């Protein structure tokens, strides 16, 4: 059994390789070592001592740069309050290592792999370093299969790939976290395997809500914690940038163990990948690097690649990753979301315009894309229906300027029919969520792919032209829409 390299090396290297702090700039420390005793890049350093008030200090740092003159620059994983120049720093001789395996299930960890849920220590028989290379080309698996989510707009227009990377792109307050919670609800509960959730730089309240929700739904089993199906890793908004920059790697390391050693199919949820980039930008600026476009770090593409390339499917097992991506000022050309786009197999773009109309999930059907929407993967019927829906919505979008200036009456009969069907499609793409039941008062709905295709085919064919458009709003399958239309008719 592998020992924890962190503990093992510290015990033997205390006197052998110690340095002292020469400079502190916020979360970044410069540390001087003896000549020829410099730690490697990504090595973990530990600062121990007492602050002026006499309280014990134990801060873990990670080496980022070798500066010359026997000095290194490191970034702290926790607050640097109370640190002073001259304090002793110990080189552990190894990268940061975190617990992996079944012991992580049902627990909440921080970036260092320490439990933060007040349920006692974790018996970490096996640990793993958070920095690794991506699997070799020969190990990768290229099978293509659809991952059904039960959400109509996703399954029809931008289907997810099993073992793929999915990005949920959206500005502030358009519903990224609610959508990721619904996906956890629909997929993680039905999916027999394990899930890992990485909370990267998001609200602590949301992390707490998710934990409570998982306990209620028995995804985390409080009576018998070993029967839980999920491990949670949090580095929230109040943490220093070093922790937010590395917490995604901690979650990924736990997921990789389930894939490579236990040979399982794993779900990895990350909320929010933009905060990983943002933390890297803070660290980069504090380290004295020249900023690149829009003030981001010059190493943006490299940092994103080192995380994303490890999230993949091998012949041993798969990691299906669903990542929320904050879009600053709703600008998809911003370097952070633009870099993430390149790594995604499917992109679900959330629109502020749809959210303002009250259509939830506010997924933009024309901006969202998927590499899986090919007739030879999803089948001719699915492909033709999806293309029909997109063409109808695109024509409606083109006609909106004419409608705004001249009104509906000036349109041709054919265009008026297109507009009526497009408005029904737009409303039928909305759906009540299980996780939003408390707010909407409507019970959540899971709609199978077969039901979804059938419903949109009926709208496109004109079978439902006589039904009012409000009958299609916030319903599950098409039978519910026809039942709602009958109810509306009786009421009127």
UniProtKB/Swiss-Prot annotation:
Record EC number: 7.1.2.2
UniProt cross-references to CDD domains, sorted A to Z: ATP-synt_F1_beta_C, ATP-synt_F1_beta_N, F1-ATPase_beta_CD
Annotated positions binding ATP: 170-177
Pfam families per UniProt: ATP-synt_ab, ATP-synt_ab_N, ATP-synt_VA_C
Principal location: plastid
Catalysed reactions listed for this entry: ATP + H2O + 4 H(+)(in) = ADP + phosphate + 5 H(+)(out)
Membrane topology: Peripheral membrane protein
One biological process term in Gene Ontology: proton motive force-driven mitochondrial ATP synthesis
One cellular component term from this protein's GO annotations in UniProt: mitochondrion
Keywords: ATP synthesis, ATP-binding, CF(1), Chloroplast, Hydrogen ion transport, Ion transport, Membrane, Nucleotide-binding, Plastid, Thylakoid, Translocase, Transport
Keyword ATP-binding part of the UniProt annotation: yes
EC category: translocase
Gene3D superfamilies: 2.40.10.170, Bovine Mitochondrial F1-atpase, Atp Synthase Beta Chain, Chain D, domain 3 (1.10.1140.10), P-loop containing nucleotide triphosphate hydrolases (3.40.50.300)
Function recorded in the entry: Produces ATP from ADP in the presence of a proton gradient across the membrane. The catalytic sites are hosted primarily by the beta subunits.
Family, per entry: Belongs to the ATPase alpha/beta chains family.
Quaternary structure (record): F-type ATPases have 2 components, CF(1) - the catalytic core - and CF(0) - the membrane proton channel. CF(1) has five subunits: alpha(3), beta(3), gamma(1), delta(1), epsilon(1). CF(0) has four main subunits: a(1), b(1), b'(1) and c(9-12).
NCBIfam families: atpD
UniProt protein name: ATP synthase subunit beta, chloroplastic
